[in-house]
Amino acid sequence: AIRLYPPHQPDLIQRPLFEAHSHIYASPEYLDEYGTPSSLTDLDQHRIVILGTDTRPPVPDLNWLETAGRETGKRRPAMSLNNIFAIRNVVEEGAGIAAIPDYMVEDRERLIRVLPDIEGPSFQAFFVYPEELRSTQRVNVFRDFLLEKVRASQF
């Protein structure tokens, strides 16, 4: 399995695959209509899209944009969705600004990185498998394949 959280089960082998980063993205149409923020505090005047709090986030700290640059409290989101792909899609269509993992936007030409000097939290992805499969050829071949693909990608 590929997990975006480290497993807590002691009988599982975990191999770090990559460290992923997230940044702030918006569409050109959104930026044309609402302007480009020049600081984190400017985000208070923008339409922030977040993952709903009743949803288990697929990646850690996905909603960091709610509090980034604020001394107290959270920004009120313009939209709260229950799926990270839906967040990417509505931002791509001009609905707002969101923190999105970079690996989800690398092939998306309609998303522009906003506040490029601001780094969101990073997180590790792990290849995880049961101890008893450690020496099986198919797991080793798949692991090697994953590592080769990871080296060729940017996260």
Predicted regions and their residues:
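Pocket-flanking alpha-helical
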Residues: 1-5
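C-terminal regulatory
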Residues: 7-125, 152-155
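A late-sequence structural motif
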Residues: 117-155
